[in-house]
């Protein structure tokens, strides 16, 4: 008998753990508060929710949700002849909850599915973010549901920030800027952002692109200094510019190693000789 009771208790614990896990995985399928429709309008909304939202896929459910919310808003604005609102504050809140509790799980399942895809569009991301902001503004979501909805906003913001990092990698003009790119890449090189194939490729190449951008800028600066040696007014002024250019090369090599600066160094060395002769003759 004791063995049977023990087995039953263990089974109940397992079921309980599984239920909790399912709740957090599913996000919003089990709201803490169950709304029972009592007034005729609440029941009307409940019927619309059952037929138009529940069991439908995201596009249809999303349209239905917004239509139903619009209906609630319209009815809530109507006043009776005595000046009182046609719907009480309680009715409005209950109707919104009925619609929210049916729609939020569909939204969360869709957004998880969308962020698992390898290609995203700006229009869909903006729509998801706007939808998430709208749902949170209703102040109904809580727990896992709230976390899932809020995560949409964070994901979209991080996606845009990550692309900004990728773009800025092509305009790095200092060692500090390159190191900053490396740090930011590490920050954003994670799921679900890396599910997006284009962004993943951009992040993977950003550090290399940043170093290449800096090296190109250093080489261009060396060429400019070398080619304009006659414009400095004195050899000392030219020498200061040459040393600054060489210091940038040394800083790069010390920070990252490598770098193709042979031609730049040769150009500066030749310009140094030319500058000595030029300023000796003309000043």
Where are these regions (language model features)?
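Amphipathic alpha-helical assembly segments used for oligomerization, scaffolding, or translocation
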Residues: 20-21, 27-283
């Amino acid at each position: 008998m004791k063995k049977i009771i023990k087995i039953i208790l263990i089974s109940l614990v397992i079921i309980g753990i599984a239920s909790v896990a399912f709740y957090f995985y599913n996000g919003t399928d089990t709201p803490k508060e169950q709304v029972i429709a009592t007034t005729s309008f609440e029941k009307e909304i409940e019927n619309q929710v059952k037929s138009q939202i529940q069991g439908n896929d995201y596009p249809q459910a999303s349209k239905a949700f917004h239509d139903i919310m619009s209906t609630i808003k319209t009815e809530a604005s109507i006043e009776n002849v005595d000046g009182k609102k046609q719907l009480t504050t309680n009715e409005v809140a209950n109707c919104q909850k009925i619609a929210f509790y049916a729609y939020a799980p569909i939204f969360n399942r869709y957004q998880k599915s969308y962020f698992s895809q390898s290609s995203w569009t700006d229009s869909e991301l903006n729509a998801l973010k706007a939808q998430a902001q709208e749902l949170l503004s209703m102040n109904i979501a809580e727990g896992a549901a709230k976390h899932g909805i809020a995560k949409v906003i964070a994901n979209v913001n991080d996606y845009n920030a990550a692309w900004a990092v990728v773009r800025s990698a092509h305009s790095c003009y200092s060692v500090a800027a390159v190191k900053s790119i490396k740090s930011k890449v590490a920050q954003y090189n994670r799921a679900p952002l890396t599910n997006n194939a284009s962004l993943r490729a951009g992040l993977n190449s950003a550090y290399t692109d940043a170093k290449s951008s800096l090296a190109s800028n250093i080489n261009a600066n060396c060429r400019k200094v070398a080619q304009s040696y006659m414009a400095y007014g004195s050899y000392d002024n030219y020498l200061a510019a040459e040393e600054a250019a060489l210091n940038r090369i040394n800083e790069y090599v010390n920070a990252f190693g490598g770098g193709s600066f042979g031609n730049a160094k040769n150009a500066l060395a030749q310009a140094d000789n030319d500058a000595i002769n030029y300023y000796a003759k003309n000043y």
